[in-house]
A protein has these predicted regions:
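Conserved two-metal-ion catalytic palm core of "right-hand" nucleic acid polymerases
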Residues: 1
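Cofactor-binding active-site loop characterized by glycine-rich and histidine/acidic residues
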Residues: 13-17, 22-122
Length: 122
């Protein structure tokens, strides 16, 4: 079951507060809360077998793709928001703005050549 809008925003607020208290000592990149309204209908179409390529500003994406909040929190506390990837959920992130685009194109081409039914989302 997908997390609610309220739960996602509360998670991000918690990250912000932890950062301000000095509990997170790595760079964090928060999302504009208004983006969530646009993402919710898109993520209704994203299936578990689909691949998601995103950036360092992917808190909403990661939660909507099914990453357990406690796992994501642990990663962010230890490493910040850059570089989170999850092979099991087929999530690839890049710390470089736009850096995942060529990787996503290659992944999509590979899936198409193999006749796969998975989709690639960027």
């Amino acid at each position: 079951m997908a997390p609610t809008k309220a739960a996602i925003l509360a998670f991000q607020d918690d990250i912000k507060e932890r950062f301000l208290r000095g509990e997170i000592r790595h760079p964090i990149h928060l999302c504009d809360p208004g983006q969530l309204d646009h993402l919710l209908p898109i993520f209704e179409d994203i299936q578990p077998q689909d691949w998601l390529f995103t950036s360092y500003r992917g808190i909403f994406h990661w939660l909507l793709k099914g990453v357990p909040p406690e796992r994501l929190l642990k990663f962010i506390v230890e490493h910040g928001t850059m570089g989170f990837c999850d092979k099991e959920r087929r999530i690839v992130s890049s710390a470089i703005g736009g850096g995942c685009l060529p990787i996503a194109v290659g992944g999509a081409m590979g899936l198409k050549r193999q006749g796969g039914k998975e989709r690639v989302w960027v």
